[in-house]
Amino acid sequence: MATALCYVPLIQSVWASNLEAEFERISWALHGHGYSRVTVDTEFYLARPDCSSNNIHPHCQSPEQRYKDVRARVDGGLGIRQLGLTLSSDHPGYPDLVWEFNFGCGLHRLPLDLETDNIQPKPQPWPRHQDPRYSNMEPINSYNFSKLLHYSGLLCNFDVTWVFFHSAYDIAFLLKLATFYRPLPPSLSDFYSGITTFFGGSHCIFDLKYLSCCTNHLYGGLDHVSKSLGVERIAGEAHQAGSDSLLTSHTYECMIYACFPFDRAARHAGILYGIHHI
């Protein structure tokens, strides 16, 4: 099933100067205007190559051990560069609303490739260096983002469904932002308690990477899975958080329709690829 879209959504670039105004738009969309699905993608950089807690291959680890690796990296070595957020509605004709939040971490850090677990040899260019329009843009302060995140209506909202692709690090970063960058919880059970508090519990979370593993024919990264379903990237570029969150949202819609009819995806809710499955 290929998606047929007659419009190209605007990916709203968000910096310190327009952060508050864009969160007001998010709050408006969530409160009585039909938007109830949130798709998130994060792009981040590896600040310290030695931040992993051990050298055991993830396939040989328990979920608790995998979580400790994620915690060690997110608390000790990864800097968030961008957060992409797409709001979608089940009502026909409602356009997707897409934001790309630009943070100040990792301007010259090496990006981590989660598919190979290796440091990529060349740093990806920072958007403000690619385009003169961004040269004077001030990156977002994480504390200000966290404060507005709490006021927006995204957190502790049990009417919202959260969608990710390879969710372990995305959710870990979101939880840090929700707790004003406090260290992640020490255990996996405490981590899930935080997820329940801020994101409505496991039944509200779907990991597209895990869902693809539950089919007989979908595998690989986001681009490969989306192409297998006939879903095209209609705005932005790969590895830019806003574009990836939008593509993840469209791919989720298509996958649910094609592979999980009659609400069969519900049985797979709350399973985080990278922690419970790999």
Where are these regions (language model features)?
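Entry/capping segment at the start of metal-dependent catalytic domains
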Residues: 2-87
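Metal-dependent phosphoesterase core characteristic of DEDDh/y 3'-5' exonuclease domains
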Residues: 53, 78-278
